[in-house]
Design a protein with these regions (language model features):
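Intrinsically disordered, low-complexity polyampholyte segments enriched for Lys and acidic residues
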Residues: 4-6, 22
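N-terminal pro-sequences and low-complexity stem/linker regions of secreted or lumenal proteins
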Residues: 394-802
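Predominantly soluble domains enriched in secretory-pathway, periplasmic, or organellar proteins
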Residues: 23, 29, 33-414, 419
């Protein structure tokens, strides 16, 4: 058994910046039509020099910052002191050289594709750089001299259609080989560095990530198996000798003498493995508070040249932990503020400079011009002089001041006596991909842009009626970028390291979808809202969320499947998953049948989860419903559901929360993450506007507090719950749906040729989302306005993996 994880040392906490005034229910005036907060904070630069992220967290990265494009995952230093970085996310991938003195990119080589995996060898100012090609199944070799690089050659590990996906690399000079991890083939491949011929392969654990070597053995982090595979290089061919259990989601590896240091992205910690015994000698927690729930996401490591200090990238905390490696124990000496979601680290040869790749850079921003969210978020590299003890103390205080999470946030935000006493039933309704401006931008009393409201009151009268009757939330942001991570954020307040690092490749058509397959890496067992509710002894029913169905004309032809263990016994089997040929009004009828049955039984589930996916739309598929017809159907279904809930005997003790899983399919003049949030409940305030900064995690936190559940992650723990939008005395007046004012049978022209294959619309977000956005815009503004444009700091279109 591994030793007990050690906590953070006592570090004085600076006062945490409060995003909004904390108000109790009793202190809030119930004034109809009044905005609940006079000030509105939105994502972006703040007066103190920090940046407010759409997640509600703040960053102020140390050092100088260099923009490098989407999702940088690799950093290496060259013998001349410059830094090589790859951007490996959505859109064009590239290999770049950064001059650390001038703090700028001075050379860039476009790549067909890239992902994790970068290594270099060389001396006397001559370097060879090896880069994994991800979906190309190739490894690229670059010659680098005098600041210029050129592609010397490349090696194919397998045919282009094979599932290999080269990832982490390790150079084996004794053997004259380079070892390449095959992330999708669960193997390690060996390439002869002289001939570029393949010299065999060794099977390892599930979804291997990266690898390091001490010359006689090769160590491979098995991302999906909680193990490190040990390959013996002293024999020919090499063989896998053992698999060392280290903990959940092992990612980055660093050798330190006779020890192996492993970043455990799923455990908030770092494991220290004694290679002589094969046992975990120590596990150190690097979270910002002891006993913190998941969320720190340590996913990258770098060792100082003297071997005394380990740097740990904490992607979820937007910081780097500075860990002193003592002979007997590790300890966190302090923290350095990074950008948004740090993903790679490197130390200079003299140990004076730390380089940090920030996967999401310095935030997002508005996309009123329709720029796709995959391009809105661009990564960066921070160039940070290594601080002395006093500087590290200042940085540590800064990290704590920037973070909204603390141990105190694990407790309920208000006392049970301060929240509505009878509120005990929650209905959680999840829809697809709309921004605030697309739907509610036409509401005059909110912060909207009516020019972007293509699904305005004429298309969505029920959403408008709900926002008008209860609360208009005009400052709500989704935590996720796309459906791949959006449903994870919606259902558990966090997206895994695996999810965050693979969805940009999936959405660039460079990797097959596997994020709802029950894969523990993407869908960690026991981590979801329904799991927590079931453990608490609550009654939970799921309608469609995280399920799959086939197209068909009847329920029997659409068997509902789920690979998520916790959903198998609580999912309604005749409720379709993502089948857009099924009207959401049909889903509303099926749900209404269940409500009628519960009413007859005199009981109602504690937690009901409902997926209404049809506002995703089918774009301009010929002879299929138009985007506005599908959104109108979705809106009518929502109105019918809220009406039926309001007629139930459970209504006086019920709250329904309605949100989008992400906001990727439209523009917004405030931020690409701003989206639609609706609340229907007798306890919701009437005719109000709430401009409090809320997130997906805020909704989760509110649900948890209603149901008596602990926070699932650091993000929902830190989030501001929606209590400002609730009142003490209920108004149980029923809600009557509004009939659709848009023809639900409106079809796209039969002659139109969509650029999206029909098969790509059979699963959520399988389609080219940029193209879908373009078609949705053109369906509403045919020839009268320019469609949203693709923008990025690099020129590039989506590429199909070959």
């Amino acid at each position: 058994m591994a030793p007990k994880a050690k906590g953070m040392p006592a570090v004085p906490r600076a006062p945490i910046f409060r995003l909004m005034l904390k108000r109790s229910l009793l202190a809030l005036p119930a004034i109809a039509g009044a905005a609940l907060l006079a000030t509105r904070l939105v994502p972006g630069s703040l007066p103190d020099g920090s940046t407010l992220l759409p997640s509600g967290w703040r960053i102020r990265p140390a050092g100088r910052v260099v923009p490098v494009g989407t999702l940088p995952l690799n950093l290496v230093t060259l013998s001349d002191g410059s830094v090589i970085v790859t951007n490996d996310g959505y859109g064009q991938n590239s290999l770049m050289r950064i001059d650390p003195v001038r703090a700028r990119v001075v050379w860039r080589v476009p790549l067909p594709a890239a992902w994790l995996g970068l290594a270099r060898t060389g001396r006397d100012w001559r370097d060879t750089v090896w880069a994994s090609g991800g979906p190309t199944n190739r490894v690229y070799r670059f010659a680098w001299q005098g600041g210029a690089a050129w592609l010397r050659d490349s090696m194919a590990l397998a045919d282009s259609g094979a599932k290999v996906y080269p990832a982490g690399l390790a150079l084996l000079p004794r053997q004259g080989l380079v070892a390449v991890v095959g992330n999708l083939s669960d193997s390690v491949y060996f390439i002869d560095t002289a001939t570029l011929e393949r010299r065999g392969a060794v099977a390892v654990g599930h979804r291997p990530y990266t690898t390091v070597t001490d010359g006689s053995s090769l160590y491979v982090s098995d991302w999906g198996d909680s193990t490190v595979s040990v390959i013996d290089l002293s024999v020919s061919p090499p063989v896998r000798r053992s698999a060392l259990f280290v903990g959940p989601h092992p990612s980055a590896l660093v050798l330190h003498g006779s020890e192996l240091l492993v970043a455990l992205a799923g455990a908030n910690g770092v494991a220290r493995v004694d290679l002589a015994t094969g046992h975990v000698r120590e596990q150190l927690s690097v979270s910002l508070a002891p006993n913190a729930p998941p969320g720190s996401d340590p996913n990258a490591l770098a060792l100082s040249p003297d071997g005394h200090t380990l740097y740990v990238a904490m992607a979820g905390s937007n910081a780097v932990a500075v860990v002193r490696l003592g002979a007997k124990a590790m300890r966190v000496a302090g923290l350095i503020p990074a950008g948004w979601y740090p993903t790679a680290l490197a130390a200079s040869a003299d140990g004076r400079t730390l380089y940090v790749a920030n996967g999401k850079g310095n935030g997002s921003g508005a996309n009123a011009d329709g720029t796709y969210i995959g391009n809105v978020i661009a990564g960066s590299v921070s160039i940070i002089p290594v601080p002395d003890s006093a500087g590290l103390r200042r940085y540590t205080s800064q990290v704590y001041a920037l973070s909204p999470f603390s141990n105190a946030r694990l407790r309920p935000t208000i006392r049970p006596s301060e929240r509505p006493p009878e509120l005990k039933h929650v209905v959680y309704i999840i829809r697809e991909n709309r921004t605030y401006d697309q739907v509610l931008g036409d509401v005059a009393r909110g912060n909207g842009d009516a020019r972007l409201a293509i699904f305005d009151n004429g298309v969505t009268p029920n959403a408008h009626a709900i926002a008008r009757r209860w609360v208009l939330f005009d400052n709500f942001y989704v935590n996720g970028e796309v459906s791949a991570d959006g449903h994870e954020w919606t259902d558990r307040g966090l997206a895994s390291d695996y999810n965050e690092k693979t969805w940009p490749q999936i959405y660039s058509n460079r990797r097959a979808w596997d994020l709802t397959s029950g894969e523990d890496l993407a869908n960690p067992g026991g981590a979801y809202l329904w799991d927590a509710a079931l453990r608490h002894g609550l009654w939970v029913v799921n309608f469609g969320e995280m399920t799959e169905s086939d197209e068909g004309d009847s329920a029997a032809a659409r068997p509902v499947r789920t690979n998520i263990p916790g959903l198998k016994d609580i999912t309604v089997t005749n409720y379709p998953g993502f089948v857009l040929s099924v009207a959401d009004t049909t889903r509303a009828r099926l749900f209404g049948d269940s409500v009628a049955s519960w009413d007859l039984q005199g009981r109602f589930p504690d937690l009901t989860i409902l997926w209404l996916p049809r506002d995703h739309t089918l774009g301009r598929q010929a002879s299929r419903p138009t985007p506005r017809a599908m959104v109108a159907d979705n809106d009518l279904a929502l109105g019918l559901i809220v009406e039926r809930l309001s007629e139930s005997p459970a209504w006086p003790s019920l709250a329904a929360f309605v949100l989008e899983d992400d906001a990727q399919n439209g523009p917004d003049h405030v931020d690409a993450h701003r989206s639609v949030l609706l609340v229907a409940s007798p306890y919701a305030r009437r005719d109000a506007v709430d401009s409090t900064f809320y997130t997906t995690a805020s909704v989760l936190r509110t649900i948890e507090e209603i149901l008596g559940l602990a926070p699932l992650s650091q993000y929902d723990a830190a989030a501001t719950p929606l209590w400002s939008a609730f009142m003490w005395r209920p108004d149980s007046t029923t809600f009557s749906h509004l009939p659709s004012t848009w023809p639900l049978t409106e079809l796209n022209p039969s002659a139109f040729r969509s650029r999206i294959p029909v098969s790509d619309l059979a699963e959520a977000d399988e389609a080219d989302e940029m193209e879908l956005n373009r078609e949705i815009w053109e369906s509403v503004h045919p020839g009268s306005a320019p469609p949203p444009v693709r923008q990025s700091w690099v020129i590039g279109e989506r590429r199909t993996a070959r």
